Amino acid sequence: MSDSFKYRAFIAYSHKEAEKAEWLQRSLESYRVPTELVGRETRFGPIPKRLFPIFRDREELAGSAELGPAIENALKNSSHLIVLCSPSAAKSIWVNEEIRVFKSLGKADRVLCLILEGEPSVSMS
């Protein structure tokens, strides 16, 4: 991870999937990267010993038309975006806005999708 990023990743999810997002955050932050991979160079920098910290918002977003400075700042300061994909996430204006903002920062190649439920091609019909 570049020193310019505060977070290894930002988890975008529908609050219906909050329990799964919390599990993923705990799992990633406690994961120990195999010793033989640590330090190996990648296009995103050297592989770290730990995938810590991971950003996950812990409260419902207020009923406003924008994400808010704390969320936007976390997106700017995250190396990667992990999207928990589900029908409810696809319908969430907040998840879609988090993806839009992250991609607008020039990091579209750092978006990782984890399909929880649904069919990937359904939203493209």
What are the residue ranges of the model-derived segments?
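Conserved N-terminal substructure of TIR/SEFIR domains
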Residues: 1-84, 103-109, 117
